[in-house]
Amino acid sequence: MKASELREKKTEELENELLERRKEQFNLRMQKASGQLARTDQLGKVRRDVARIKTVLNERKRAERQA
């Protein structure tokens, strides 16, 4: 997911998306630990998605404080 796509979404949608990605990240970590995860690159993609979402949310919080 691109940061430009995330910036178009509402804050509530971003928070829900963050929750979903965190759940997915947890499930992938459990699969990796049990040896069931075949595509380990998925873990990195989800981690970067979480970082992008958090970045956009923090940008909005900073903008609110400055306004």
From Swiss-Prot:
Keywords, comma-separated and alphabetical: Ribonucleoprotein, Ribosomal protein
Pfam families assigned to the protein according to its UniProt record, in alphabetical order: Ribosomal_L29
BP GO annotations: translation
Keyword Translocase: no
An example Gene Ontology molecular-function term: structural constituent of ribosome
GO cellular component: cytosolic large ribosomal subunit
Protein family membership: Belongs to the universal ribosomal protein uL29 family.
Designated name of the protein: Large ribosomal subunit protein uL29
